């Protein structure tokens, strides 16, 4: 059985997230999703949607078999617990595949890192784009 892990913030869940998770799920038999904790998100602005609500929405997706919040202390802790065969990263996630692969190997983890490519068929496939559209609207 091939276990696949996908990670992300999933703030303002949108079609791009669903496509990313769906493509990740096709790589194996079980898809585990690790949702970033509010307290660990440092590379962008604070999420609009609280972590428990983001987790609830990710769990509701048909393509997701298991979903959990990440660790506040050690980002590799849930990875060690799941022991996946594949770890996916999205086209716009800041990870360098080779550097992440090295970090996994250093920790005795054998998962292969796979970047999921961008899907241009979804018009609102970016949380940033959605925020910009909201700002432009008369709401």
UniProtKB/Swiss-Prot annotation:
Q: Does the keyword Isomerase apply?
A: no
Keywords for this entry? Answer: ATP-binding, FAD, Flavoprotein, FMN, Nucleotide-binding, Nucleotidyltransferase, Transferase
The entry lists its GO molecular-function terms as: ATP binding; FMN adenylyltransferase activity
The reply on keyword Flavoprotein is: yes
What EC number(s) would the UniProt record show?
2.7.7.2
What Pfam families is this protein classified in?
Answer: CTP_transf_like
Matches recorded under InterPro entries: Archaeal_FAD_synthase, Cyt_trans-like, FAD_synth_RibL, Rossmann-like_a/b/a_fold
Q: Which domain of life is it from?
A: Archaea
The record's annotation in Gene3D superfamilies points to: HUPs
- Catalyzed reactions per annotation: FMN + ATP + H(+) = FAD + diphosphate
* Pathway assigned in UniProt: Cofactor biosynthesis; FAD biosynthesis; FAD from FMN: step 1/1
For the ligand (ATP), the binding residues are: 9-10, 14-17, 92
User: Per its Swiss-Prot or TrEMBL entry, what cofactor is needed?
Assistant: a divalent metal cation
One of the protein's GO biological processes? FAD biosynthetic process
Q: Coiled-coil regions in this chain?
A: none
UniProt cross-references to PANTHER family, sorted A to Z: FAD SYNTHASE
HAMAP family from the entry? FAD_synth_arch (MF_02115)
What does this protein's UniProt record list under function? Catalyzes the transfer of the AMP portion of ATP to flavin mononucleotide (FMN) to produce flavin adenine dinucleotide (FAD) coenzyme.
Sequence similarity: Belongs to the archaeal FAD synthase family.
Assembly description: Homodimer.
According to UniProt, the name of this protein is: FAD synthase
Give the source species: Methanocella paludicola (strain DSM 17711 / JCM 13418 / NBRC 101707 / SANAE)
């Amino acid at each position: 059985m091939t276990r696949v892990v996908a990670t992300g913030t999933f703030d303002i869940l949108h079609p791009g997230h669903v496509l990313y998770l769906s493509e990740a799920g096709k790589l194996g038999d079980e898809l585990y999703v690790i949702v970033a904790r509010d307290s660990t998100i440092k590379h962008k602005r604070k999420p609009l949607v609280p972590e428990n609500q983001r987790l609830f929405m990710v769990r509701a997706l048909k393509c997701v078999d298991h979903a959990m919040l990440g660790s506040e202390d050690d980002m590799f802790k849930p990875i060690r617990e799941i022991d996946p065969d594949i770890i996916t990263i999205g086209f716009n996630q800041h990870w360098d595949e080779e550097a992440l692969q090295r970090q996994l190997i250093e920790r005795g983890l054998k998962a292969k890192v796979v970047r999921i490519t961008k899907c241009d068929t979804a018009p609102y496939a970016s949380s940033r784009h959605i925020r910009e559209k909201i700002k432009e609207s008369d709401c």
